[in-house]
Amino acid sequence: MVQKYESPVRIYKYPFELVVAGFRNFCRQKSVLRRGKVCEMGSIFGEAKTTTNTWCIRRWSFAVVCKKIIIEEFLFLFVKHQLYQYLCNHIVNIEYAYHKPYNSFATRVEIFEKCRYYAHPENPDWTCFDQTATLDIKNFFGIEHSMEKMGMKQYTQTTLKGKEIIEFFVNELKQEGITHVDRWVDDATVTSTTAGAATNTTPPEKPPLCRDNSILDADYIAKYLGQLTPLQESKLVQLRKRFEHGTSEHPEPDYQTLLRFLRARDFSIDKATGMLQESLQWRKEQRIDSILGEYKTPAVVEKYFPGGWHHHDKDGRPLYILRLGTMDVKGLLKSVGEDELLKLTLHICEEGLRLMKEATKLFGKPVWNWCLLVDLDGLSMRHLWRPGVKALLRIIETVETNYPETMGRVLIVRAPRVFPVLWTIVSTFIDENTRSKFLFFGGPDCMHAEDGIEQYIDTDKIPSFLGGSCNVIDCPIVALPNSVCVNRPVSSSSFDSSIVKLSPPPALSPHAFCSVATAIAYSLHFATLNGGIAHDHHGLYKAVDLKPGQLFELLIRNTDPKSVLTWDFEVLKNDTLFAVFHTEKEIEQSGNDDFSSVFDGPDFKEGTNYKKIEQSVKCRPKEGVQGSHEMASTGTYVLQWMCPPSCDGPAQLMYFHEILSSANYKGSMTSLQSGFSSNSLQSR
């Protein structure tokens, strides 16, 4: 594959005529041209055009091993200089072509380089410069592509010398007392001669400038994009050309956007093009460009969503704070739905893009990503509610696909010991480069600890709930009231995310599935691939109807001490009593009367050979309960639901339970001890 290089526009803050005067001494720069001679020189219509053909030798900037194979120390170049002086259209074209007909290697390598100097279209006191180059190696021991990439990489390391050379000779002219060269103007002779030769020769058009004054010069790169290598600059220019004809419906991406997608695909132009095209199509279909002006935050989200923008970090990145541990995930999903939470996330991402541009202007340096601080104080097993995790994975997929490289740093503070479970589930779906930006602070004092968050956020900007002096987002752990939970399906198709193509997680060995959390991630992933869960009760929760006085007992035999039993259920109709029991005996599910318990037999006595480990709690209609319990010993655990005899009608509920392996919790069980008074919080 032919390797291409295209430079951004370099700006010389000198008039075109002065730059050309310095350019005439170009061949005196011995570090670039070893020796040469003029073999042909012609002039057309006076000074309007001058063509100079030159043989020269240029050092072959390649690895030593390649030079040994090629048996060449220098490249013989055929250089063609074309100097146009035509009215106001001043252009110098320089063409380099590798040529050595008596060497067999010349038939296997093709090198072409073209440089252009031209007057700045908007400022006559400045001169523009750009260059292109191609390298094509054929039949080179089967490693042509690798050699081409190596050669182009070596070439780009020398491109910056071009500007230094011209600067050197302009300064040399100044030392000689030449600080001004008369401007070339249209005189009668040149005009008449030009008119006679117009049918034969047409000066090349000036290269068009980028729209919106976004000309990609060195100053623009330093101010808005940051430090880039010449090869990265070239990739950026080439990608821009693929999207330079924007429309009102499909606006041309700015350089910051192009650079983000290039970084996300390791500067592969083809991969970045495909990713960006899909994202632009998605933005058009979902009207993302108008989301900042049209989106209205639901009242429930404004009141109960614990997140918001908060100043900047020490690097100037906009800082967003999310108190995930205080969030009632189930309540929010049931009140506004999964689609609305996705739209909220996209609105936050669009705000982040706007704030990054403002920060760039405010701090006078490139700011092309933002910082996220996530407070996990209060995180418990209730956050592992399966539909909630599924919604989170969908949000991650959408953001990773359409907002790459916007996350500069993620600060995870006050992470409890249950956090590794959630991290195991979601990290599989986060890009590896993004995962490397996560920093974890597990202790309660994450502010003053060694390498604490003071290293990343100014002390006067640290929130008060972390020990700082800045008041922000004071959200106690609170469940949404019944009045706002409308039992909305947590997953729907009104917001189309089909453009987000989910790729399978990295392959794992069979031993990896000893982590139940990883298995959860896989099952959620492939459930999403197959269309997802249309409703949080479908295929996951089981329904139970209980008459007044009737019991339903779920027997769970445990052979894995220190494993964790989790449950989640929702009462749909009438009051229900719930409790958890344990016995060391192994009990089989029997066909006993539904109005009696397995512990009603003569072989069982409470406190002797079985005990109640979760006290009975009354659950009212439309209440949801999540809980967990460490199964410290083997035996049988019993989840029991009962419709009180005093009820005037049958009770209905939906339930789900899961056992998490002890392999994930060794030495980390304290945070999982749950009762209804602490970690097993009710979510309404």
Swiss-Prot record:
The keyword Mitochondrion applies. PROSITE patterns: CRAL_TRIO, PRELI_MSF1. It comes from Anopheles gambiae. GO terms for cellular component: cytoplasm; mitochondrion. The keyword Nuclease does not apply. Keywords: Mitochondrion. It is found in: Mitochondrion. This is Protein real-time. Residues 2-178 form the PRELI/MSF1 domain. Residues 537-684 form the GOLD domain. Residues 297-474 form the CRAL-TRIO domain. Its main location: mitochondrion.
